[in-house]
Every structure is written in C-alpha cells, then in structure tokens.
Amino acid sequence: MKSVLLISNQHPNENGIGNPIMYRMEQALLRNKRVSKVKFVPFFNNLKSLWQIRHTAHDYDIIHIHFGGLYALIIRIILIGIAKPMFITFHGTDIHAKSLQSAKSRLLRWKIILNQKASFMSIRLFDRCGFVSENMLDYIPQNIKKKYYHKFFIQSLGVDYNTFTISSKEKAQDDLHFPRGKYILFSDVSNSSIKRRDLAEAIVAHLGTHYKLLVMCGVKPCDVPTYINASDLVLLTSDEEGSPNIIREALALNKPFFSVKVGDAAKQLEGLENSTIISRNPIEAANTIKEYMSKEYVDFTRTKLQDVLDFNIINERIIDLYEQI
C-alpha cells in the first residue's frame, strides 16, 4: 500500500470558494484499498508553506504535485535530498500558455511565459510527468518531448461520484431558492473574461425568453452538483481551456453539454447524441442547441461514461503508476 502526498497551489480560499479538484482527488484516493494514507497540502506563497511541504514529504511514499509553473519548480528544488518518487501533473495553461492571447498587461504576460518555461524545466526534474489531455503534448518543445517522453502519462481528470449524485431539477431549484424554470448553466467560477460570458448571454438571448442563463460564480464546491442538477443544459464558451472538468461534472449528472471548440471539449463530447460542439456565432449556436434539445435524451452519460468519468476508476490507473516506480 502506498501513501501519497498531494501538493497544489490551486485550492479554495478562506471562504471555501475556488478550485476544489485537489480535495476531491484526495477523498477519492482515500477510498482506495491500495492507498494507506493521503494528504493534500495546499501551497501558499510563503516560506512557511515551503517548510511545511518539505517537512511533510518525509512521511509519504509518493509526492505528486498538480499544476505546473514556477511554484512547482521551486517546490521540486526545495525537495532535493528527499529520495521519494516525484510526480507532477500539468493542467493546461501551465504548458500551452494560451492565456497570453488575452493578457492585458506586460507583467501578466511575463508571468505566463515564466510559468510555462518553469513547467518545461520541471519536466527534466520530475520522475513522471502527467498531462490532463493528450493535446497538451503538442505544445512541448520537440527536444524536451523526444528526450523525456518515457516519463509522460495522461491523467484525465474525473468526478467524485459520491459527491455528484443526481437529483431532480425541481428539487435542486428549490434547494437553491430559484423560481421554477428552464436554466442554462454557465460556469465562471473566477469571473474571468476568458470564459466569454458575453457570448453565452448572446446565445441565450437567441434561444428565446423561456431559457434563463444561470451563472455559477463564487459558488462553494459543495453547491456545484446542485447548480448542475438545477439546469436543463450546460454551456461553455471560453476562449481558452485545457481539459474543462465542468464537462465531466455535467455528464456525470446526465446533463446535455454544449461547447465551442476549445481545449479537449470535442474529444469529451465525441459520440454523444444529446451534446455537441457549437459555433461561436450566437445565432448558429442557438439553432444547434434548439435542435439537440428537441431530441429525446438517450445518452445517460453517468452510466455510459463512468469508466472515464469516475475518480474511483481513474485513480486505479494512477495508483498503477505509483506502484510501478
């Protein structure tokens, strides 16, 4: 049995709002019989946090950092001398740096470039390097890819089926104290212009007055399943994404999903009857959504795609890697 230390700079803030992926990953690993103990240590930008990580690392068999960038490189350097297998999983912009396209200041652009360069350097230093989608490999310099390809693995993100359980749309709307109606969920947790809320609003406007846009922003992670259950469909209009987990979360709750072509959205929706890629033209997108929503729901993706959605199943493949090294 392996003990695993998870580290990331992505975590909910003091109000419980933010990226919950690491806590959900921790809980899913804790349920696995091949894992003796798991601890997630969030990284904060201070020396105390670095000291805590190094001190804690001695007590675990595997150290696995999620999300690359300068912070991950610094942690790897801080952990020099600790003879434990070191894993890192990159999640998107830490490799492809597509957010450069929308960066509004020179300082932010330099930060994005620095984090990308630090990620490339980290590939040399870690024992195994994971990527949440295969298309991220296209952004790695050829000399690095060729030399270190043997370290690479794909770690698809997943959904905690114990947390994401289906309830009726009406009950979910009542739980959120929303008026009964037809809602299109739009996830914009960080209130970022990259998510293109303006495009989502334009699409919904062309769908007619019977649909309302439900914006999920500043929501605690425990409320996310309720928001999805309360909706009729989920919409993604971002300019940039890596491997958006909101797609998996919606499919795990049997919700139709409509996304512009971004990240690996097309791959996630491939072969589905009730979900599809839509145009960035609001009128064309609205027409596609109308067409698909008029169909009978037949996908039942929670069951059909459980092998690629359920954290409990996905983690088995990661634990295989832990045991091989």
Report each predicted region and the residues it spans:
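A charged, aromatic-enriched C-terminal amphipathic alpha-helix characteristic of glycosyltransferases
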Residues: P20, R280, M293-Q324
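A short, active-site helix/loop in glycosyltransferases that binds the activated sugar's phosphate group
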Residues: F120-H150, V159, T163
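A short helix/loop element that forms part of the nucleotide-sugar donor recognition site in Leloir-type
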Residues: T165-F178
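Conserved acidic donor-binding segment of nucleotide-sugar-dependent glycosyltransferases
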Residues: G271-I283, K290-S294
